[in-house]
Structure formats: C-alpha cells, structure tokens
Amino acid sequence: MLEHASDIRGILVVSAKEGAQLGTVSEVHIDPQTKHVVAFSYRTRRIGGDRYYVPVEDVDRVGRDVLLIASEEAVVHQTNGEHAPGRSLEDLQGMRVTTMDGKHLGELADIDISYADWSIGALVLSGARRLPVEVADIRVGDGVLVPADSAGRLVEPAEKSG
C-alpha cells in the first residue's frame, strides 16, 4: 500500500524501549539516487527544540499518529549545520516533472511511498494527478525526469460526488 510522504509530517516520534515521545516529524528525506526514503527529521517538543533525525532502517512502524523507533539510541542529533541524509520532501515539492522527450507534466506536489521497502511508488503532481512509477525509471536532479510514455499513465483524481 502506498501512502503520501507528506502525511508523515506532524506525527509523533516515539521510542519503544524508553516509552518516550521524542518530538514530531518535521521532514521526510529521500535519496535522489535510490529513490527511497532514507530518514525522518524531527524537532523536540520544546519551543525552539533541537533537531534530530532517525535513519529509516531504525523505524519499526509508522502508524496514523506515531512513527515508532526501537530506541533513542537510533537518533542522530543535528548539530552545527549537520543535515539528515538525502533531500527533504519540501525541497523536492514544486519541482517540474518532465518526460524524457520534453513534455512538462506538472509540478511535484507529493510522493507516494511504500512502507514495506520505503521506495517511491508514485509521484503526486499538481492537480492531485498521480503517476505510478518504477524507481529505476525516474531521475531526480533539478527537476524530475520520467519515461516518455508517462503522460499516458497519469491517473486523474476521482470526481467527488456532491
């Protein structure tokens, strides 16, 4: 099952071993080479709280309200300008999504990910259109390049009945 990566922002980070609420997810980080989620950043709950990140391999489970990690030992404190690995979803949002033959499909609004292996399964474009993708077929740089036949695979949002 695929979930919007942006839906993870704002949920609690909880350590199972210590039974502690560590903070709330502030960002999802994606490796542009592998096209997989690699980490989650969070801030402590105090005003002006410190920034930390958790590598995805240390995440036990993601629920509707909680990102569960085994222990606080997995947490990396971001100090002196240190950043989590990969690129943040926020940095990727708004990028132009273009086919290899130059057709502009829209701007990246979100990414659908699989919790099973943390891979990108679909790109969500402006207008809530979805483009199912294979990670090997997309390129992420200053923009997102997708195969030439991608325009024909765009899924329009379902009409809402009133």
What do the PLM-derived regions correspond to, one by one?
Residues 1-162:
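Peripheral interaction segments used for macromolecular assembly
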